[in-house]
């Protein structure tokens, strides 16, 4: 297992480089003048003409040279200093928010992670529990009802369901506002006496014993959590039900019942563990998707996460920000897939990772 994990970690940089090279190559399909127009807002006014911009940033260099400069930095012709470079911790300047990309992501990633964590609790819990319940009561009333709910949830587009709950619970009832915090809670969070531990407001509020801020942050999370949890819960329920039905037909469960084991023991100790492989696969991919930022959901609810940042960056042609998000997303995806593969070995000893 240790050798397998080490080997996968060694592959991680190769995958990240491959993803960023692909995006960089797509960006390089634009002419130097077109690319200069994308970055012109990053350049001080004294730079002048487009030719000066192209010369300063080497936009007419070969693609591999430009990629190398993006990774390790580029020496400034005037000062001789090396500027930029992903390996030096500099992802460039974001014109979308007017600040360094790394600084923006340091605020956006915790926000997206907080949303993903809270959405994963009902999604995974209800998805697996109700999926097992549906399979155990196959073709009975409860199975039919759960199947209808799962089909409805899986078929409704995210933006439609999000707008529906937003109109009902915010526009009409005024219960759960969009955004991340109320104005009064933001003032408390930004005060000198408030200590920031994780940049996740719900967890930081608990650590600061600010329970009113915790409730306010949680209230702002209700609608995006509901949207993400229901839509993904529906798919996870269907996968769990299908996997459990396959396992429940196996003869070893008949043998377990013949030995006098309670049905609950048969289901939880013998059936469910053997049905977890596809559940872990789907659940892991869904969770990785949530951590990468859910663009539509964050945009609908005005939630300042990585997904909404990516949407705004794409709309404003902020290529540097898009590259930064792609770099982080590829890291999350590779590490998430590694975690899923490792969980296979713990759940099912028959799987040997060699």
Give a label for each model feature:
Residues 27-28, 69-73, 147, 166, ...:
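Generic alpha-helical structural context detector
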Residues 12, 74, 112, 116, ...:
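Short alpha-helical functional segments enriched in proximate histidine and acidic residues
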Residues 2-3, 109-114, 118-142, 158, ...:
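Alpha-helical transmembrane segments of integral membrane proteins
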Residues 1-62, 102, 106, 124, ...:
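N-terminal signal-anchor/first transmembrane alpha helix
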Residues 37-38, 65, 80-83, 90-94, ...:
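Short, hydrophobic secondary-structure boundary micro-motifs
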Residues 16-72, 169, 173-213:
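Hydrophobic alpha-helical transmembrane segments of membrane transport/permease proteins
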Residues 26, 30, 39, 74-75, ...:
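Hydrophobic aliphatic residues
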Residues 59-128:
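An internal, D/E-rich "acidic patch" concept
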